[in-house]
Structures are given as C-alpha cells and as structure tokens.
Amino acid sequence: MIRANGMDMERISQTLVAPARLDAEREAQLVEWYENLIEMMRMEGVSERGHLQINKNIITLLTDLHLQLLKSTKFPFYSAAYYKALPFIVELRTQGDNRNLSELENCFEVLYGVLLLKLQKRDISEGTLQAVKAISQLLGLLSDYYKKDRAGELEL
C-alpha cells in the first residue's frame, strides 16, 4: 500500500489514514507508523520491490507454524482449509515469478494483488474470488493459531 501510494505521506494520509476515521491521537499514531515503515523501506533498500526484514521474519514464523499444524493430527480443520486452498496455491505457483516464493508468500501476494485491483476499481474474476475466499479462510485460521501460539496457548 505504501508503494501503491508512491511512498508519499500526503497520499497515504488521504487514501489510507483519513478513511480510517480515527480520533486525533490514533490518527497521529498511524501517520507515525507509516512514516516509520517508509523510513525502514528506504534504509533496507526495498523502496521499489522486496519486503522488509521484519515481514520476512513473520513469514518464516508463520511458515514454521503452518508446517507444524499440517504435521499434527490435532488440527483437522486447518488441514481441511489447506487442502481446500491447495489447488489455488498450486495454480498461483505456476504463474510468473511465484515459483520461488513459499506457499504462504503466494497466498499473501494474491491477497495483495486483489486489494490493489479493488482499489483501482477493476473487475475480479469469479475464479480469483474463489481462490481468495479459500486462501483467506486458511490465513484466518493460521492467524488465530499464531496468536494462540504467541500467547503460549497452543499445544502442537
């Protein structure tokens, strides 16, 4: 979203901060957060493409948890969500530069791409919407398990 707005804080304030309709204190915090992210992107040399190291670290943690959940027999709903999303993930991995990304990175990339299409008010195919639904369900479950894991409430 930062790159889509040209790393320009004025545009970010108009397109991302203002629509959130926050009180003055929270709005100032959000502006500062975006400013810090922009600075980090410049410092890490990812202004044009690539991900911040902090994002790479989170993807690594999520991937580790994802694999542990799939190996365990305690999480059948997660496994079911994964196998429901898997055909879409496989299709994504065959397109473009996606082969070198992890499955989860592919999932996040498609959600980001669809978000950009929506912001541009472009049409989204029915097949893409089906993929997004399955992938969103998978990532939603993974997010819930990640929060539980971080809180020490998840037994794998």
Where are the predicted features?
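Charged, amphipathic alpha-helical oligomerization/scaffolding segments
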Residues: 29-36, 57, 61-64, 84, ...
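Short acidic, glycine/proline-enriched loop segments that cap or flank alpha-helices
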Residues: 3-5, 22-29, 49-54, 72-80, ...
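N-terminal interaction modules that seed assembly of large macromolecular complexes
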Residues: 1-48
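Helix-rich interaction surfaces within compact, conserved domain-sized segments
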Residues: 33-36, 40, 46-56, 104-108, ...
